[in-house]
């Protein structure tokens, strides 16, 4: 949990609903407890006064998160957590202001692109409805990075309609190629 996180309790409740035993870890801690999964929640870490997630990516706890991920541990970032993982260098690309420069708060659909990983291998559905609330969720990367992401099958989720059709009309923030979520090359960071 970082100063300004406001979805940490929501994430705690959601994970408990699925049978996870959770422990909240503060940004100033230096060590992670023994874990199967590290989740970086949404919110506005450090008020998002600089680039979203940039200050949190330099927090003391992030050294342990980086080491955990590099050792093969599973890490997931949601909303501001995604921004933090990008800023920390665990995921490629950047997250920019939304295409129409407005805060977006609504339900959207995403289509799972890659089930060859521990996050989605047991999912029966291909399309999920999620709630989003962000000002800087526009995923962008260079052409070279995009080519590498495609070659390594790193796109986890695409924005889609309820039936799983991927198109620009269902892309709420202008993300390149309608990308809603990505993996690292090893597919242990989402």
Residue ranges and their predicted role:
Residues 13-14, 120-190:
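C-terminal and late-domain segments of enzyme folds
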Residues 26, 114, 161:
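Residues at the C-termini of beta-strands that transition into short coil/loop
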Residues 81-82, 116:
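Short, flexible active-site-adjacent loop segments at beta-strand->alpha-helix junctions, enriched
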Residues 82-83, 137:
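Short hydrophobic/aromatic residue motifs in ordered secondary structure
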């Amino acid at each position: 949990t970082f100063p300004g996180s406001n979805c940490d309790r929501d994430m705690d409740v959601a994970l408990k609903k699925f049978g996870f035993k959770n422990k909240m870890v503060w940004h100033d801690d230096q060590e992670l407890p023994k874990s199967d999964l590290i989740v970086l929640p949404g919110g506005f870490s450090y008020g998002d006064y600089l680039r979203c997630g940039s200050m949190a990516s330099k927090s003391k706890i992030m050294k342990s998160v980086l080491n955990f991920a590099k050792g093969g541990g599973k890490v997931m970032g949601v909303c501001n957590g995604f921004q933090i993982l990008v800023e920390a260098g665990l995921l490629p690309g950047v997250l920019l202001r939304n295409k129409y420069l407005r805060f977006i708060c609504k339900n959207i659909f995403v289509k799972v692109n890659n089930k060859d990983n521990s996050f989605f291998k047991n999912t029966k559905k291909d399309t999920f409805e999620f709630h989003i609330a962000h000002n800087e969720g526009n995923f962008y990367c260079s052409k070279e990075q995009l080519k590498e992401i495609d070659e390594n099958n790193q796109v986890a989720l695409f924005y889609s309609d309820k039936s799983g059709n991927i198109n620009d009309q269902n892309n709420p923030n202008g993300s390149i190629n309608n990308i809603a979520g990505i993996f690292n090359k090893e597919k242990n960071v989402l």
